């Protein structure tokens, strides 16, 4: 049985890498550090850092904290968090992902220009909470591209100028499906960009938004900006190919991970013999037995952008030692 470890489309993204690196440096220096929320949506990695001295706190605890240092994770935070920090004399170590920080700026400018901001994402995801905070929490969050959730679309003002953006880790096809359905919905209520045949919304760039904000040419009434992180979305096709190339897939990620859910579904669609775990104690021996009763020929180990590479190596090592490995893979 060959064990193949995916190093090209699995493991921490750049934003999470930066956060973990800073957290480790701070902990090495002082042995203690507060983190607002889980530093990453991976329980195993959180426990590793907590063992080094990190303390994870929630918003109520953060609001009671005084004169301490607090890490802001890659997901980012709304303006209210920074206001609390100033009020409570808290030193903020801000590791917001640059892609997320740029998106927050875009959301803020669109809101200031009077746009109703629609966010394709998950309402309680910390990144979305941070983005919506830039809109005074007035953004409309939609998770279902088919507009099937009436509660999600109920707040929409179909006569107002509107901009569509996205949580950085959502799926690209879903974003464009949502755009298409919003175009149809708004057009049915008589709101479309002048000169468009079927109510197409117009793509805008940062320079367009900045220009209007500084008194330049006005943007169309109905616009969209694809803000999905391409470093994340580019993994989709690679991971699909990886899943197809192996008899069995063991996908390691935290169950809180939004990206993990998306990537696992890609693996599962490509290869029905794909299994989700958080750690090695969930691995089952029957996964590695083929329909002929013999061991499968290959097992692929992969994970999410929030999965540390050391955990994937641990999984490969465990499977290799427990069930056998003839690939010559040094990680197994």
Curated annotation (Swiss-Prot):
Pfam families linked: LYTB
InterPro entries xrefs: LytB/IspH
Binding site for isopentenyl diphosphate: 41, 75, 125, 257-259, 306
Protein name: 4-hydroxy-3-methylbut-2-enyl diphosphate reductase
Binding annotation for dimethylallyl diphosphate: 41, 75, 125, 257-259, 306
Family, per entry: Belongs to the IspH family.
Organism this protein belongs to: Chlorobaculum parvum (strain DSM 263 / NCIMB 8327)
Role summary: Catalyzes the conversion of 1-hydroxy-2-methyl-2-(E)-butenyl 4-diphosphate (HMBPP) into a mixture of isopentenyl diphosphate (IPP) and dimethylallyl diphosphate (DMAPP). Acts in the terminal step of the DOXP/MEP pathway for isoprenoid precursor biosynthesis.
Enzyme class, spelled out: oxidoreductase
Cofactor binding, note field: Binds 1 [4Fe-4S] cluster per subunit.
Chain positions recorded as (2E)-4-hydroxy-3-methylbut-2-enyl diphosphate binding sites: 41, 75, 125, 168, 257-259, 306
């Amino acid at each position: 049985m060959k064990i193949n470890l995916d190093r090209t489309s699995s493991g921490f993204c750049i934003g999470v890498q930066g956060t973990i690196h800073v957290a480790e440096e701070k902990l090495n220096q002082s042995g203690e550090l507060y983190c607002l929320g889980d530093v990453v949506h991976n329980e195993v990695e959180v426990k590793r850092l907590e063992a080094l001295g990190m303390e994870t706190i929630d918003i109520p605890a953060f609001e009671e904290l005084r004169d301490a240092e607090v890490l802001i994770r890659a997901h980012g935070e709304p303006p209210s968090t920074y206001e609390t920090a100033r009020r409570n004399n808290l030193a903020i170590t801000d590791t917001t992902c640059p892609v997320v920080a740029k998106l927050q700026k875009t959301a803020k400018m669109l809101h200031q220009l009077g746009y109703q901001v629609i966010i394709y994402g998950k309402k309680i995801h910390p990144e979305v909470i941070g983005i919506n905070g830039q809109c005074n929490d007035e953004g409309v969050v939609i998770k279902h591209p088919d507009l099937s959730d009436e509660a999600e679309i109920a707040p929409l003002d179909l006569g107002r100028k509107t901009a569509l953006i996205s949580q950085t880790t959502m799926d690209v096809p879903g974003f464009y499906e949502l755009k298409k359905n919003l175009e149809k919905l708004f057009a049915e209520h008589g709101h479309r960009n002048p000169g468009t045949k079927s109510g197409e919304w117009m793509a805008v760039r940062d320079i367009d938004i900045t220009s209007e904000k500084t008194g330049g040419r006005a943007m169309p009434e109905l616009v969209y900006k694809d803000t999905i992180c391409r470093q994340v979305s580019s993994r989709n096709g690679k991971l699909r190919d990886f899943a197809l190339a192996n008899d069995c897939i063991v996908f390691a990620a935290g169950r809180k991970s939004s990206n993990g859910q998306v990537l696992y579904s890609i693996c599962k669609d490509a290869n029905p013999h794909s299994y989700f775990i958080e750690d090695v104690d969930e691995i089952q021996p029957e996964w590695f037995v083929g329909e002929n009763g013999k061991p499968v020929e290959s097992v692929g180990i992969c994970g999410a952008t929030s999965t540390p590479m050391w955990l994937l190596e641990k999984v490969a090592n465990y499977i290799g030692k427990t069930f056998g490995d003839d690939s010559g893979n040094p990680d197994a």
